[in-house]
Design a protein with these regions (language model features):
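Glycan-recognition and catalytic cores of secretory/periplasmic carbohydrate-active enzymes
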Residues: 1-207
Length: 207
């Protein structure tokens, strides 16, 4: 767990965008070399880059990488119960993952830069607008699967209680193993308003 914490801190404090996006470089170079030529400059592809190497217009931020960031933090939360990991899950889900799909669900981004410019002095590898077909077609199905599974991240049950992980108007009715039925309603206009009201309609007797 200590090694995973070290990786998490490096990503979130030095290699992640404010949107939860990560993997800033499509093509780049690394001074770390290779195992057989440690002093050489090595070409890298689809990588995190150096600390704070977070360009805006040329950011790669592949949609699949942003989903991977969500999944990594979800596993870290399941292991520890620490809410800081769910903060990243929420950030990715509502920002860097949603940006990868159009409102009508028919066009997609492979990359998710923070700034689009028509005046760059060079050509980028991927389109600057969402398109219906991407030659590397991993991101569209991955995005749809993640959005269809979003409700699975909303709540978590544990022996100690229930975690409300994501804010959003919804209802929950579930059986809490040997404790009985739990039913609640969450009312909110989040993210447009910050007020959240949770009403417990049925509470297990053993809770």
């Amino acid at each position: 767990m200590e090694n995973l914490e070290s990786i998490w801190k490096d990503i979130t404090s030095r290699k992640m965008y404010i949107t939860g996006a990560c993997g800033a470089l499509y093509d780049g170079t690394s001074p770390d070399g290779t195992c057989y030529e440690p002093d050489s400059i090595q070409k890298v592809h689809q990588s995190y880059g150096r600390p704070y190497q977070l360009p805006n217009s040329t950011a790669h931020n592949e949609t699949c990488a942003n989903i991977g960031n969500l999944l990594f933090n979800w596993r870290m939360f399941q292991t520890s119960g620490n809410a800081r990991y769910v903060d990243i899950v929420e950030n990715c889900l509502y920002n860097s993952i949603l940006s990868g799909i159009s409102l009508d669900g028919k066009r997609y981004f492979y990359t998710n830069p923070l700034r689009i410019s028509a005046d760059l002095p060079y050509t980028l590898r991927w389109p600057k607008q969402r398109t219906e077909y991407i030659s590397c077609f991993c991101c569209p199905p991955h995005t749809l699967r993640t959005l269809c599974q979003a409700q699975n991240y909303a709540y978590t049950l544990s022996p100690e209680g229930i975690y409300c992980n994501l804010y959003g108007a919804n209802t929950l009715t579930t059986n809490w193993k040997d404790k009985g039925e739990l039913a609640l309603v969450q009312e909110t206009d989040y993210p447009w308003e910050g007020n959240v009201r949770v009403t417990l309609n049925k509470v297990p007797r053993k809770a």
